[in-house]
Amino acid sequence: VICCSWSWWLNHQHLLPEPEQLIAAMLPIASLEDPLTAARVESLKRQGRDWFRTLLLPEALATLIPAIASLRRGGGRLAILDGRVRGRSWGEQVLRALEPWEALQRLLPD
């Protein structure tokens, strides 16, 4: 069992055996507490644009897809615990990006 950040996983996954299961507590959505992210969001707000769907969500998906590539190749399971995927309107976009997928009834081991 490895508990790590998305950035750690992206930088080190090639050094580890392919996982059978990856459990993501939260999606890799950039924090507004990061000054660069906050400035970019503020710029989009001033332009009247949807800063979440224009910036944060695409960046999160661009992080997520390569982060799970080895899992997909090996036929492993991805469990996303982030309730926002089911509870927010943008969750469908996340699920579409992960297709094909199916809901898990339980986590490993079976």
Question: Where on the chain are the PLM-derived regions?
Answer:
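Conserved RecA-like P-loop NTPase helicase motor core
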Residues: 2-88
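Short, low-complexity, polybasic intrinsically disordered segments
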Residues: 87-110
